[in-house]
A protein has these predicted regions:
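C-terminal motif of bacterial Sec signal peptides marking the signal peptidase cleavage site
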Residues: 8-10
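Sec-dependent signal peptide recognition
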Residues: 1-2
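Solvent-exposed, well-ordered loop and adjacent helix/strand elements within mature globular domains
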Residues: 12-352
């Protein structure tokens, strides 16, 4: 009966998360097309700063992409109409979407800011760890919480919230504020323990604690605020994976391409299809403050500059910036938009 219900539900094409059905069916992740037809409002202004950072910081990516970047910049400044991209020597490959109708999933990530102290006390007692020398036999989360890394000098600071540290692990990096000397520092990703990742959001859904349709980072935080420390710890221990950090000498938020990320211009992507530095034209779904699609998309230029373990094929993870509000916005995203990879004439679907 359950399978029958699911089958019947699948007959109606969903549109509640920004899905569109405008271009027929696709059978590949990247599908060469001759033109883009989009009447969405345009906003390309974040792309230029992201492009300049790539050209300044990465000679190798500059050598590969500079000609494309300048052509895209010329188009954005003098036309901006996606129907004219071919006039600027730019070819297109549309992403097929997980459903085969061009609906690419957008999720979001951000850089949290958490409060730390250099020394533990009765409140700030949960450590943030640097990478231990444990090779392929690193302890899992339960063992680490039980003290498996104690006495190794790996503590970078102490938080009052086990969940805050966990959320920084999920994002892969974040900012920390040491109130004892009013220092803001960026903690970059420094590796993980090699154990499999388990979604605590999925665990809460399966336990009936949070409805599937309301699941978000905000929903997890609200649930945790009502629990005692032992209950929160038990939930976090369902995920044996553990992320380690290293202090950065700058406040730049770096993606895996080694380039500072600009909010709403950088995405994590599957580098098998979108190598680092790839340029994307995307109809990005817009959400209201409650995290629901507001019926609109905005046409943006994006750049693939990061990766993620869960970001595969027709999935983009949009960087939202730093701080609490960015986290709320990013945590709501699991919506859809059309996406095209851009390349110089004759280059697609491969790299330009």
């Amino acid at each position: 009966m359950a399978l029958l219900v699911l089958g019947l539900a699948g007959c109606a094409r969903p549109t509640d998360r920004g899905q569109q059905y405008l271009d027929g069916e696709f059978d590949q992740v990247l599908n060469p097309v001759s033109t883009v037809s989009s009447d969405k409002p345009r906003d390309y202004h974040e792309f230029k700063q992201q492009m300049e950072l790539v050209l300044e910081r990465s000679p190798s990516m500059a050598a590969t992409y500079q000609s494309l970047y300048r052509q895209v910049e010329n188009w954005a400044e003098n036309s901006g109409d996606p129907a004219t991209l071919g006039n600027y020597g730019i070819d297109l490959a549309q992403m097929g979407g997980g459903d085969g109708y061009g609906n690419v999933m957008f999720t979001g990530y951000f850089s949290p800011v958490i409060e730390l102290r250099h020394q533990p006390d009765a409140t700030y007692r949960y450590p943030v760890y640097a990478m231990p020398k444990c090779g392929t036999s690193c302890p899992n989360r339960t063992a680490i919480y039980a003290g498996a890394l104690d006495g190794q000098g790996l503590e970078l600071g102490y938080s009052a919230s086990m969940l805050d540290i966990f959320m920084m692990e999920v994002q892969g990096s974040g900012f920390v504020h040491f109130e004892d000397n009013d220092q803001l520092q960026y903690f970059a990703y420094n590796g993980k323990n090699g154990h499999p990742y388990v979604s605590i959001g999925k665990v809460l859904i399966e336990r009936g604690e949070v409805p599937r349709e309301k699941m978000s980072l905000k929903a997890i935080s609200e649930w945790a605020a009502k629990q005692d420390d032992a209950t929160v710890r038990e939930l976090l221990e369902q995920n044996p994976s553990f992320v380690f950090f290293k202090p950065s000498s700058t406040l730049d938020v770096m993606g895996s391409a080694g380039i500072p990320l600009q909010a709403h211009a950088a995405v994590a992507a599957d580098r098998k299809y979108l190598p680092m530095g790839s340029v994307l034209l995307a109809e990005v779904p817009q959400l209201d403050r409650e995290g629901k699609w507001n019926g609109k998309h905005v046409l943006k230029l994006l750049m693939a500059l990061d990766t993620g373990g869960a970001v595969k094929k027709n999935h983009l993870d949009l960087y939202h910036g730093m701080g609490h509000e960015a986290g709320i916005d990013a945590g709501h995203y699991k919506h859809f938009g059309r996406v095209w990879k851009l390349g110089l004439h004759g280059s697609l679907p491969a790299m330009p």
